[in-house]
């Protein structure tokens, strides 16, 4: 038909109000990072495994169960993760596996647009003499 569905997924924050996850474990949140919207999720500190597992399962779920055409990752500059495999890389890997033979779109919002981390997704420029 020519119409694709891309879901906006937000793994960088839960919101400043109504977040009750600390009642289950304070380790779900980072002890060193803070986002623009409140507490950051724990992707790279001690006991980060449950948070990482949840996010990766969520990525697989949307693509495998609903056959979405892609995911748009909200405000990736607020995903703080110094792991050997950062959560965004792991999510991209899992998304491709969940999609199987289907082509999918993975879009990473990054603000400000001139942020130097955006260079990681650009092709190297060829210098002409």
Where are the predicted features?
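Aromatic- and acidic-residue-enriched carbohydrate-binding clefts of CAZyme catalytic domains
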Residues: 1, 15-68
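Short, well-ordered coil/turn segments that N-cap beta-strands
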Residues: 2-3, 8, 67-69, 100-104
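Generic structural signal for well-ordered alpha-helices
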Residues: 7, 59, 63, 85-92
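Conserved, mostly hydrophobic/aromatic
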Residues: 8, 62, 73, 106
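Aromatic/hydrophobic pocket-lining residues that form the small-molecule binding cavity
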Residues: 11, 52-55, 84, 88
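Active-site-proximal loop/turn and secondary-structure-junction residues that shape catalytic pockets
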Residues: 11-15, 47, 77-79, 112
